[in-house]
């Protein structure tokens, strides 16, 4: 597997993370030797020790921004805390989603007792009907959607798509098991259909406008 580097300078490196790869292991994780993390993968390919600025869920693919020094991390993180970074995701969801929709609904934070304001803009790009029965219907409908999270809550996009009854395919926690099982059985797809496709921001050190696009992984259908 090759490392897909989207951008690199003296301050950061941006890569296209594959599906089913942790950004980094939890401290004292027992799986460090058994399972390659993104940080380890980058080190193997470049000999760079890098520091994550943000995270993608293990089963989400796409753009990840990493700093080359710990002292650079806070400047890049400010882009996210100030919502000064434009994020675009692509997902496949159950059913025919609305042409456009703004989802304004609180999402639980890392403290599961506290809800935080969350806003997502959604647009449907394509729809398809598969002549494959998925209970309780004789065929199955799906939509390719473009998602713009305007806040950065944990699992925000996954929760918001469930809120409008169009869960992401492959979402074992919030999704529809019948449809997930069909994709495994018919297509061998056992990942989450969520891809961080674009990241746009003004570089905090050079003031350069950075516009990154991560191609879909080969295993996207």
Where are the language model's segments positioned?
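RNA pseudouridine synthases
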Residues: 1-221
